[in-house]
Every structure is written in structure tokens, then in C-alpha cells.
Amino acid sequence: MATFPEPEWMERYRDRVNADPELEVIGSWFTASLSFAFGDRRYVVRVERGRIVDVNAAPRIDSRASFGFRAPMAVWAKFVSPDPPALYHDFFAMLMRVPEFVLEGDGLVAMQNARALHRMMNLMRG
């Protein structure tokens, strides 16, 4: 079993996202690069039409992303747990109430794709 947030876990996450029928419908306009910083580990994920087409597990400092999410591992561990505690059950709740969970970059791009992004984030619990 792949351990969060190792590259194998990200591959499984990519497969869940790409196989999700809901994202196939609501993600058709979601095209962007986003970053996930899980403590010290950072990934840049490229999404095209709601599908993850590339996972960069070793991005250089100049790897670009439209927006991203950054938090300590303890915060992410609560979010990806099968039964997350209050405030960690939804990334919108975390943005509002968990100061360590940070949206970086262009928040407008993130919110323009809020529904697809919300589904994509929830699939982390797969």
C-alpha cells in the first residue's frame, strides 16, 4: 500500500481522479497547474480538462503553478484520513479555520474551478 504522500500515493491519486465519472462532467473546463506542499514534499500537478496529465514529484524552484495548497504534514494527515475531524473534512473549511492550511498563488483560478477542485481534493481520501 502506498504511503501518503510518497510518489506511489500520488500515482494512485492521479488514477482515482482520472477514473472519476463526476470529474469527467464537472471538470471539463478545469485546466491549470497546481502545487501541493505536504510538509517538505512538494508536487506540481498539471490538470487538463479535469484530468491529471502530469505529476512532477521533483519540481525545481522555478516550476510554475497557477495556485497551490501548503500545510504541515499533520494537517494533511487529518485531511486525508478516512474520517477527518471537524474543520479538516473539507478544504474550504480548512482555508477558513486552519491557519496552517494556505492557498498560494492565484486564488481566482482556484475559485473559478471550485467545484471540480473540491471533488479532486475529496478524492485524496480514496
Where are these regions (language model features)?
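Feature captures hydrophobic
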Residues: 1-126
